Amino acid sequence: MMFDTADLMNAITTIQTITPPFIPSDAEVMTSIIEWPAGSAGAPPHRHPGGPSFGYVLEGEMLFELEGEAPRVIKVGEAFWEPGGDVIHYSDANNRSDIPLRFLVTMICAPGVPMLVVVDEDELEQRRDRRVPRQ
């Protein structure tokens, strides 16, 4: 039986198309599932210095905030991304107090560079003008 290419194309649903600012040569790629319990504040403010990250919400709702962007809710079946480099990721909190949050994230990183670096309070204060005020 011959495979019908149209069947393959009908099976694919594109949820996100991004042109990342950079992908390091000799990049390493890590795909992880992160699980936050109901009401969790998620990871502290951090960055991905070695490259961009791409994610997809599997369960629950994420309160997502990047430096320079207003916070937004990402729901099941929706995708998100971070440019990496110097941009601070302020929130990946569970937006719900009644159900857990599970999301998949694929991080691209230059060899020898940490996948994630927590941002300290002094730097957060120095860069507070880059954060979009919550409404």
Where are these regions (language model features)?
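A short, N-terminal "cap"/entry segment at the start of jelly-roll beta-barrel domains
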Residues: 1-30, 71-73, 81, 117-135
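Short, well-ordered beta-strand segments in beta-rich or mixed alpha/beta enzyme
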Residues: 58, 76-79, 104-108
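Ligand-binding loop in jelly-roll beta-barrel domains
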Residues: 70-71, 84-114
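Short histidine-centered beta-strand/loop micro-motifs
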Residues: 43-48, 66, 73, 92-95
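Short acidic-glycine-tyrosine-enriched beta hairpin
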Residues: 24-28, 36-37, 61, 66-86
